[in-house]
Amino acid sequence: MIDLIGSKIKVLGHSDPSLIGREGIILFETKKTFLIQTQNKIIRVLKSNGIFEIYSENRKVILPGSKLVGRIEKRWL
């Protein structure tokens, strides 16, 4: 299990074009969303609609949001 809270994240692709390129720190996550602190504000982003670059535990991974949907405790990367 990998806890992504506190990890850096960047939105590489999303069904909402206004989110592409946004980056920040993951503050919280639910089964379907990330709560991200950007420079200016806190945004909620649907996982299933995006492609994300995540820096966690000294490594960078690029993942489709569909791989991140679900309960945190059941996720293995």
Curated annotation (Swiss-Prot):
It is found in: Cytoplasm. It is an enzyme of class 3 (hydrolase). InterPro entries: RNase_P/MRP_Rpp29_sf, RNP1, Rof/RNase_P-like, Rpp29/RNP1. Pfam families: RNase_P-MRP_p29 (PF01868). Its EC number is 3.1.26.5. The keyword Acetylation does not apply. One of its GO terms (molecular function) is ribonuclease P activity. The keyword Hydrolase applies. One of its GO terms (cellular component) is cytoplasm. It catalyses: Endonucleolytic cleavage of RNA, removing 5'-extranucleotides from tRNA precursor. Keywords: Cytoplasm, Endonuclease, Hydrolase, Nuclease, tRNA processing. GO terms for biological process: tRNA 5'-leader removal. Belongs to the eukaryotic/archaeal RNase P protein component 1 family. Part of ribonuclease P, a protein complex that generates mature tRNA molecules by cleaving their 5'-ends. Consists of a catalytic RNA component and at least 4-5 protein subunits. This is Ribonuclease P protein component 1.
